[in-house]
Design a protein with these regions (language model features):
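Hydrophobic, aromatic-rich membrane-embedded alpha-helical segments
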Residues: 95-122
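Membrane-embedded alpha-helical segments of transport systems
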Residues: 100-108, 130-155, 326-342
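Re-entrant/interfacial helical elements at transmembrane boundaries that shape
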Residues: 113-122, 285-302
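Transmembrane alpha-helix interface/packing and boundary motifs in multi-pass membrane proteins
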Residues: 100-109, 272-293
């Protein structure tokens, strides 16, 4: 056998392996790296003691209970979008898809959204590109909301961030130089132009397939403009993000340190931590583990008393970080455990639903 005949297959496997490493290796490395950096600056034994002895788990339970509401609301909201492309799954199926997405993302970051689109398309025998497009529209709507929340937070609660700039000028300079770099924006513009040119003028089956795929995505996204129930969709969006905030807010009462920060500074502490953790969840990682705690502790530090500054009292600063880590790790661990256990139940229900459908389709018809 000519060894050259295996070369394309070998290259395909290499590409597949590289793709898997990018999809799963990078998010895992981010989660592990941030957790290692986090635990390096805290007293782990003291953190565990705080969780065991000081945490009021009733508020953590309330946090988890409130967390179920956004899943129900998101399922209802996506159902409105799917109706616009004539896809009408039962509500329980939408709930399975949304809950399964969160569970899927714990193990396979960023693939949960692809999975839910594929699941709905397969079960409802609908075109995948259009269902995927409606999902993209769903996530883009969330991106717009996050951007608006971020702007509002910076506009009305800029004092803590100004404090950060004065405390860490080097970090601010690095971020500013990156955002204003012509090389960064030029590279992004060049990549966009190349992609547009390939899709516009390229030929071949692959390019044609990609073009049709994006056409389906656009049709799913454009369906929002003509869908019925826009008012209900906007109301559900407001409820969704209000519940996300309420979920974090009630968790602040679970620990003495976070409760005291709320009492001293007001609800703005929770608002800023909510905004930062929401942005952090966009970083590819396993269920937000790593970025979530890092963003939460950073937000808490913005309101830390001067007496716990690292330059003034290193021991007190470490104790503050440890208490913040206890808070962040408890919240993310409880949510992750819920998604794992709930995900197992949901996937069992999906399997049972599939068996019922297969049995119904195989059953002989009686005339």
């Amino acid at each position: 056998m000519n060894p050259d005949t295996n070369q394309p297959t070998n290259e395909l496997h290499k590409g597949s392996l590289a793709s898997k490493l990018l999809k799963f290796g990078i998010p895992l490395a981010i989660s592990v790296g941030l957790c290692v950096a986090l635990f390096r600056d805290i007293d782990f034994k003291e953190m565990m003691r705080i969780i065991r002895e000081e945490c009021n788990f009733w508020f953590i339970g309330l946090n988890l209970l409130i967390g179920l509401i956004p899943i129900v609301v998101r399922a209802a909201r996506w159902g409105i979008q799917l109706k616009a492309i004539n896809v009408r799954p039962p509500f329980r199926i939408l709930f399975y898809a949304i809950f399964g997405t969160y569970s899927f993302n714990v193990v396979f970051p960023r693939l949960g959204e692809v999975w839910r689109s594929g699941y709905i398309a397969y079960r409802q025998k609908a075109p995948f590109p259009e269902v995927f497009g409606s999902m993209i529209a769903d996530r883009l709507a969330d991106t717009v909301v996050v951007a608006l929340l971020t702007l509002l937070t910076f506009a009305f609660a800029s004092a803590p961030f100004i404090k950060f700039v004065h405390t860490y000028p080097d970090a601010y300079d690095k971020i500013a130089s990156l955002l204003t770099s012509p090389w960064v924006w030029g590279g992004l513009a060049a990549a966009a132009i190349v992609c547009w040119a390939l899709l516009r003028f390229g030929k071949g089956k692959f390019i044609s397939g990609v073009r049709n795929f994006f056409k389906g995505i656009w049709e799913g996204f454009a369906a929002i403009a003509k869908m019925d129930g826009k008012g209900k969709w906007l109301l559900l969006t407001a409820i969704l993000w209000s519940c996300y905030f309420l979920q974090l807010y009630v968790a602040f009462f679970a620990f003495p340190m976070t409760r005291e920060l709320l009492e001293a500074n007001g609800i703005i502490v929770a608002i800023i931590c909510y905004m930062l953790t929401t942005i952090a969840m966009g970083i590819p990682s396993n269920g937000g583990i790593g970025p979530y705690q890092t963003a939460l502790i950073f937000g808490l530090q913005l309101f830390a008393p001067a007496a716990v500054s690292a330059s003034v009292n290193p021991a007190a600063h470490k104790a503050f970080l440890t208490a913040g880590a206890a808070f962040g790790n408890t919240v993310i661990a409880a949510q992750t455990l819920t998604f794992i256990i709930g995900g197992i139940i949901v996937f069992l229900l999906i399997a049972a639903d599939r068996r019922r459908n297969e049995a119904a389709s195989d059953a002989p018809s009686h005339k």
